[in-house]
From Swiss-Prot:
Keyword field: Phosphoprotein
Stated name of the protein: Protein NOI4
Keyword Phosphoprotein: yes
Modified residues (Phosphoserine): 44
PANTHER family, sorted: PROTEIN NOI4, RPM1-INTERACTING PROTEIN 4 (RIN4) FAMILY PROTEIN
Amino acid sequence: MSDKGRPLPKFGEWDVNDPASAEGFTVIFNKARDEKKTGGKPGSPGKSSEGHVKSGGGDPSKPQPKKWLCCMQAPAVDS
């Protein structure tokens, strides 16, 4: 964002009677959102939620199957 010293305006501060006034806010909020996603570096790729790269040659655009683990224990029998 080019105006780093300027605080982010509060949501809804625009003039509700002039819808065109909201356009500037949309740009400001979109820039702030993008900077948050990229860690403040415009043009850099977003941070990955995973800390490692998966190997295995699967197609990354397809969802991976979920793996489940279910454990059961029989109740203790008193004798």
